[in-house]
Each structure stands twice: as structure tokens, then as C-alpha cells.
Amino acid sequence: MALMLVLFFLAAVLPPSLLQDSSQENRLEKLSTTKMSVQEEIVSKHNQLRRMVSPSGSDLLKMEWNYDAQVNAQQWADKCTFSHSPIELRTTNLRCGENLFMSSYLASWSSAIQGWYNEYKDLTYDVGPKQPDSVVGHYTQVVWNSTFQVACGVAECPKNPLRYYYVCHYCPVGNYQGRLYTPYTAGEPCASCPDHCEDGLCTNSCGHEDKYTNCKYLKKMLSCEHELLKKGCKATCLCEGKIH
């Protein structure tokens, strides 16, 4: 079964200049993900960064907002539990990954997402972290090729020095152990989806997921009529020609 790398990101290690909003009037309510403008900022920032990957990616899906995941992300943020949620609390019709950001400053969503993405500096594509203690799992989830839905929530946790708690959920989940350091396929943008491309990102998402990492092999060995594949390899069996 596919395994997920469990990581969290401590925003307090970043310089205050990156985290602190320049506007003195900025309040937590302005970051509420119930606002359409905030949802658009989060989705747009993710898509912008997915277009910027190096080496360029041939099969990165364009991301969109997921309202069910928004509910889950906000509920977890409200708990002020500074650790990852169990997988059952971040599952919609798909299992979702999770990035956490904690800050003593009221950071913009774009700053939080950029902080995760900046881990790319510590990763050699298709090889691994440049240093043994480097954290790169937030970056790989942000740019995981088959993830096409995102939603987030934020809460204030006054009892903690890192009082602002940001949670984003990514569906379907990324960071499979089998290819953790290869979050997408290197190549010309949209080379894997020439007929389904929008500004360098693919639009042929699947809507299903594989629960096993060897579904392609299982399909050849057993065929999609087998009960094992019907339950655990829906993407492989139902999404031919789509990114999954």
C-alpha cells in the first residue's frame, strides 16, 4: 500500500520579514478560506509554483479548490493540534495529503505556500535531499503531479507561541514512498497531456486514486476484472489517458 511521508513545517524558523504582513490592518478574518478571493489566491499560488518547477514537468495537473477538503482542513486547524491529522479526517472521496505551517506572525497564504515550496533548494530531483536532515516533503506535496485539488484553513491558537496555524489538504494524496523524490515527470510542460493543456499545466485529472503502488503490474497480471483491482486500483483501471 502506498505510504505517505509525515512531515510538518515550522514557520518560525523563517525570517520575520518573510512572515509578517506589511499591512498593520491585516487580521485573521482576511485570511479566512470561506472568502472566494482567498481561495483564488491559494489556488493561483499553487499553480504558479507548479509551473516554475525545475526541471520542468510534463505531467503536473492544474489545481482547483475542493470544498469538502476545506471543511476538513478548517476543522483540524481549529483543534490547534500541532501535528498531522489522521488520514480518516482528511479524506473526501479521495485520500488527501496535508501540509502544516505554524507562525508567531500573521503571514499571508502566499508566504506560507512559498515557504513550503522553497524546500526545493534542499532537494536534488530524482535523487533526494542534499543533506540528510533536509526537509523536502512539503515541497514535493505542493508539486505532486497527480494532486489536483487543494483546500486550506487557518486558526489562531493563543496558548501557543506559534499562535497562527495554517493547514492545507491536497487531494489525491502525494508523497508516495516509492517515488518521493520524483514528484512529477521531467519534460516539456504538458508533454504528457498535449490535448489537455492550459498554460503549461495538464487538465486531464482522474478523480480516482490507486491504493497500491504496483497497480500497473497488477493490471497486467490479473486484469481490471479482478476484485482486488476494482477496489484498490481505480485510477489505473478507470482513468486511461488521464494523469493519476
Swiss-Prot record:
Q: Which residues are glycosylated?
A: 145
Its cellular-component GO annotations read:
extracellular region; transport vesicle
Occurrences of domain SCP (ranges): 44-170
Keywords, A to Z? Cytoplasmic vesicle, Disulfide bond, Glycoprotein, Signal
Is the keyword Cell division in the record? no
- CDD domains (UniProt xref): CAP_CRISP
Looking at the record, the residues that make up the ShKT domain are: 206-239
The record's subcellular locations are: Cytoplasmic vesicle, Secretory vesicle
Tissues and organs where the protein is expressed, per its UniProt entry? Mainly found in the cauda epididymis where it is synthesized by the principal cells and secreted into the lumen. Binds to the heads of spermatozoa. Also expressed in the submandibular gland.
Disulphide bond pairs:
190-197, 193-202, 206-239, 215-233, 224-237
Which stretch is the leader sequence? Answer: 1-19
Q: Which factors induce or repress this protein, as stated in its UniProt record? A: By androgens.
InterPro entries with a match to the protein in the record = Allrgn_V5/Tpx1_CS, CAP_dom, CAP_sf, Crisp-like_dom, CRISP-related, Cysteine_rich_secretory, SCP_CRISP, ShKT_dom
Which family does the entry's similarity section mention?
Answer: Belongs to the CRISP family.
Q: What does this protein do?
A: This protein is supposed to help spermatozoa undergo functional maturation while they move from the testis to the ductus deferens.
> What protein is this chain from?
Cysteine-rich secretory protein 1
The gene name on file is: Crisp1
